[in-house]
Every structure is written in C-alpha cells, then in structure tokens.
C-alpha cells in the first residue's frame, strides 16, 4: 500500500506545478522575491515608501456554485479569473491596489492539465488586476469529492495610503452614483440559476438570439475586473467617496454597505438597459423583480459615488479603461438604505 493507492497522486501534483509555471510567470511584479514552489511567497514593500501611512487591505472569496457550470461544460479556463475578480474588486472598493494573490484548489482527483487550465484563468485575472500570483495550493481529496469536481478559493492583499481609503464617511446629498456595466451574472446566485434552467448539455449549448450566444456561454462569462477603471479614475484626480461591488445580495444588500448613517441612495432602473440574460432568467424562472435586484447585479457590477463636479472626469477615465459607465442615481439625505425607482 502506498499514498497513490489511497487516491493521492504526488507525481500528478508535481506535473501540475510544472504545467502552471508558464502562466504564473506572466503575472510577476518587480516586488516579488523568489519563485514558484517555495513554502511561502515573499513580496517587497520597499517601493511604497512614498506613502505617508501605507495600509494593507485584504480579501478572500470563491466562485460559489458557478464551478458546477464549468464541470457541466467541461470548460475550465475562465473560472480562475472569476475567483480573482471576486477578491480584487473588493480590495479596489477600499481604494486598494491589489499586490498579490494566492489560490487554493481542492479536487477529487488531480488531473494536471485541468488544474493548469484553471490556474491559467487565475493568472489571466491577476494580469488584468496587475497583481502577482505568488503562491497557491492544490489539495487532492479522494473520497471527499467526486473525481471530476473541484472548488477554488482566492486570497488577495493590496495596499492603499491610509488617507486614500474609501470609507463613504463624507458622502453628501447630491453626490452622483456611477455604475460600471457587468459582463453578466458574474459569480453569485448560481444556485438559483441552476433551478431556473435545466443543467444539461442540450440546454446549455442551445444558441439564443436574444443573448447572441449559447446559454452556457452567457452564464459562464467571466466576472469583470474593475481594478484598472478605478486606478484610472484615481489617476485622473478624482476622489471616489464611496464604492460598492455588486455581488451576492444585489443592489439591496451591497449599496447600503458603502453608506454612512443619514445617507440614502436612489437608483434609477431606467438609467441603463438590463442585459438579456437577466431578463431571460426572470422570465423563465418566474422570479419577481425585487428578488432579481436582491440577488444579482442586473448589469451593474460596481458603483462609485463622486462629487458632481467630478462626473465627467470619472466617466472619461472609466471609458479609457475599457469599461462602460452609466449615471445610475444620486445620494440624498435620509435613512441609510437604497431605493430603486
């Protein structure tokens, strides 16, 4: 009896690491010390001495049951980018610049090519966010998970000067809310998605005119990463007063998280067109509109609040980063919360 007979293939683990090295290499930043394969990842803080009070911000997240869709479609090259997006977008909400990222993959069986493909998506997300993939873990769990299934989680650390942390504390009535378009469902609410649609090959591979693609392609579209857009906004000299990443809980749960007491957000639903995938989900699943806005991003993945004088500069910076911004509402005095009208 040996370890391999028990279901853990050490050689497969070694092969996975070798296959993923080429992807990881493309994410490196000058501050990274050492290479892949050590017991830990090291990152120099020397280049941040210009900050008055350098402050680390961190985030951890996963992709929820969206991974189930990757299994069903046998498509694993974008789910890693989803994981990165969920972490770095949260860091960006605090005004942070993502520095590095670590991933954790648990699988029933280590198929090296599949693991490397997952990591290629992680690396792509890191490149979009400008952060280094400095470490990770692939854990083989025979008997605990089915052989063809896996789960992944991510951990990211960023930096911001303390004076630049986005807190929402100085929001004022009249401040403008600008939302950036999402790429689709992003990475939450997939348990409901799997109840709305039959999760079989025929259903997922059916082309829909209203979507302009198959259902599976629309659902598996990788989560948009907003780090570059927020970086461009900052470099344009705009001070973002508050920021909300629209994830699980949709508008109703996430927008109040950026508000101080005594400030109320008003969102105009007609300020942009809700993407077809959400319209289809509501129709096919007979999901009430309020539940949709309380579960999904409904086409807006990130919302920032800025002074009215900064609106034009903010929109221009977001467009320069390749994002699509909309003026979606404003801040008013009142009970902390959000109204959709």
Listing of model-derived features with the role each one plays in the protein:
Residues 9, 61, 174, 245, ...:
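Residue-level signature of catalytic and energy-coupling elements of molecular machines
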Residues 151, 164-211, 215:
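Short, acidic (Asp/Glu-rich) active-site segment that either coordinates a divalent metal cofactor
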